């Protein structure tokens, strides 16, 4: 990485556990990266894994002041690296989805009048009506989610109208009525980021707004009925003022950078601020993702993303407007129990293994056991498959409380059997393959209506599987991804996979400011994107016999989920 004399663009990624700032040049070369890890780098916040928790009510939230501290630190780090801020032409960002920030009536004045001699943390806390932001792992809103479902008649109808299902504003105005009354504007985490750089409360992004359950996707406007439910006594017009208008162009210039940053860091006064999007929409912008390509983000959560022209909402999935391209949608599956659940199994294997754990690779025992276990955990070709659900936190898909379930499944029309049992299981050894398979089987089950055959005689599946996030470094997990999900062209890793959100945000800024009239993101970025530099094939994809075995496993997995759900309701 080195300096560049041409225009530069910054993409920020404000995720659950860290803030990253990534700088690219016009030709998409990464020239600087800075990051701030909340657990190890923040001072004065009693957090764990980036959040505070109230276990009694299932609340998970983050102190907004910590994010301000992180932004101060990341900008200072970029300065120390030698970034010439005067060359930065545009800024965009990515924010963890479903989190909200509450501004008070002094916010505009404070944002617009920051003192260049002081930090953001010292000045902006006074602009908030509530000091915390709910996190996507929060499970305190089940009552509110159920009300949203019932309000439009069913969860299927809510999914059809809004692209997904459920939100925190309804709970916030009930639990903190005084803070809600003092709230003049509400931001998502993404628009909060943009607001700081803009020096004014920024509008929502056309894609990220779809995660609020208030945006009518077929009509592309606020849904008046859902606003009424969410607004409480103050009424829908008051809530609409707090939410603001939403520009439909994901590349629109919102304005120039706040004078605070020009004074403190020597940004050029003409540096443009563009809409910041959600972390998941930003991830699909980290490469020109084509329809039928799938991206799997293996981070704290497990997330499956596809770009598709088809709008086929379902209560267990999320659809969003594409962050840059009208006429395309982003399909998303998001699971709370991703990396944290895999880590629990890893730790159990390390604790019981006779092998010494390599401190430089704590996954070595897990990977070895995973690869030694045959697909489906079948000891013999005709033996039962081992299946499980591993939820250390309450899960969204399926909607279940925390717990762990183990099943044996024998496929076949004549002798099919599904049985909840630990018979034949060796814990935690068998859990390694079972947990990885369970996460990928759920993805295959829920994406099957959106994939089709990539070539004659080949069963429906993605064309390519791209892995991003921390788990993308794990070759054993990548191998199982290809076995379960297919991918006729194989499984690939983005070589900056852990920086995918920040990279997508930076690309979005490049496109917003350098596009020709009507030029799409896919066209501009596709012309500059060098696949051989950014992508590495790390595993085989479609293998006919194993893919067929997992087709049978999907049937058992679906039945297992239904049985556990039915028992949970009793």
From Swiss-Prot:
Its main location: cytoplasm. The keyword Hydrolase does not apply. It is an enzyme of class 2 (transferase). Keywords: ATP-binding, Carbohydrate metabolism, Cytoplasm, Kinase, Nucleotide-binding, Transferase, Xylose metabolism. ATP binds at residues 363, 470-471, 474. Substrate binds at residues 98, 279-280. Gene3D superfamilies: 3.30.420.40. Induction: By D-xylose, L-arabinose or L-arabitol. InterPro entries: ATPase_NBD, D-XK_euk, FGGY_C. GO terms for molecular function: ATP binding; D-xylulokinase activity. This is Probable D-xylulose kinase A. Its EC number is 2.7.1.17. CDD domains: ASKHA_NBD_FGGY_SpXK-like (cd07776). GO terms for cellular component: cytosol.
């Amino acid at each position: 990485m080195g300096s560049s004399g041409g225009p530069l663009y910054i993409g920020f990624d404000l995720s659950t556990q860290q803030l990253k700032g990534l700088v690219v040049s016009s030709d998409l070369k990464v020239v600087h990266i800075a990051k701030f890890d909340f657990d190890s780098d923040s001072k004065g916040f009693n957090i764990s894994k980036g959040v505070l928790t109230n276990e009694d009510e299932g609340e998970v939230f983050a102190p907004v002041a910590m994010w301000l501290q992180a932004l101060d630190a990341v900008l200072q780090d970029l300065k120390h690296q030698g970034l010439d801020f005067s060359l930065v032409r545009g800024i965009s960002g990515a924010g963890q989805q479903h989190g909200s920030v509450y501004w008070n009536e002094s916010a505009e004045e404070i944002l617009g009048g920051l003192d260049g001699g002081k930090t953001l943390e010292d000045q902006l806390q006074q602009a908030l009506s509530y000091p915390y932001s709910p996190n996507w792992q929060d499970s305190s809103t089940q009552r509110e989610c159920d009300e949203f479902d019932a309000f439009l008649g069913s969860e299927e109808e809510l999914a059809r109208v809004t692209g997904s299902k459920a939100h925190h504003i309804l709970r916030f105005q009930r639990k903190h009525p005084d803070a809600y009354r003092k709230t003049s504007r509400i931001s998502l985490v993404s628009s909060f980021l943009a607001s700081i750089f803009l020096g004014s409360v920024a509008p929502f992004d056309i894609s990220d707004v779809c995660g609020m359950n208030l945006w009518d996707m077929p009509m592309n406007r606020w849904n008046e009925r859902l606003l009424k439910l969410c607004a409480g006594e103050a009424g829908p017009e008051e809530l609409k003022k707090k939410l603001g208008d939403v520009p439909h162009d994901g590349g629109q210039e919102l304005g120039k950078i706040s004078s605070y940053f020009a004074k403190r860091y020597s940004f050029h006064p003409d540096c443009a601020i563009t809409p910041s999007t959600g972390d998941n929409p930003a991830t699909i912008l980290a490469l020109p993702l084509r329809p039928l390509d799938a991206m799997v983000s293996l981070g704290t959560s497990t997330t499956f993303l596809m770009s598709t022209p088809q709008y086929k909402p379902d209560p267990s999935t999320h659809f969003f407007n594409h962050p840059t391209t009208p006429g395309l949608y982003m399909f998303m599956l998001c699971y709370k129990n991703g990396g944290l659940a895999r880590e629990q199994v890893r730790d159990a294997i390390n604790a019981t293994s006779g092998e010494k754990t390599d401190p430089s690779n704590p996954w070595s025992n897990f990977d070895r056991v995973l690869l030694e276990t045959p697909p489906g955990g079948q000891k013999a070709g005709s033996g039962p498959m081992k299946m499980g659900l591993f939820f250390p936190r309450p899960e969204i898909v399926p909607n279940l409380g925390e717990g762990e379930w183990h099943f044996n499944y024998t496929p076949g029309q004549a002798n099919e059997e599904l049985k909840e049992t630990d018979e034949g299981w060796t814990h935690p050894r068998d859990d390694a393959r079972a947990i990885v398979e369970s996460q990928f089987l759920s993805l295959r089950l829920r994406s099957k209506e959106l994939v089709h055959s990539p070539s004659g005689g080949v069963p429906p599946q993605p064309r390519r599987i791209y892995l991003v996030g921390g788990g993308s470094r794990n070759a054993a997990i990548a191998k199982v991804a290809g076995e379960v999900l297919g991918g006729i062209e194989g499984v690939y890793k983005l070589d900056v996979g852990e920086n995918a959100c920040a990279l997508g945000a930076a690309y979005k800024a490049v496109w917003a400011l350098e596009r020709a009239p009507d030029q799409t993101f896919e066209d501009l970025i596709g012309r500059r994107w060098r696949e051989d530099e950014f992508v590495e094939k790390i595993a085989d994809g479609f293998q006919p016999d194993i893919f067929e075995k997992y087709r049978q496993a999907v049937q058992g997995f679906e039945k297992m989920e239904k049985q556990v759900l039915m028992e949970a309701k009793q």
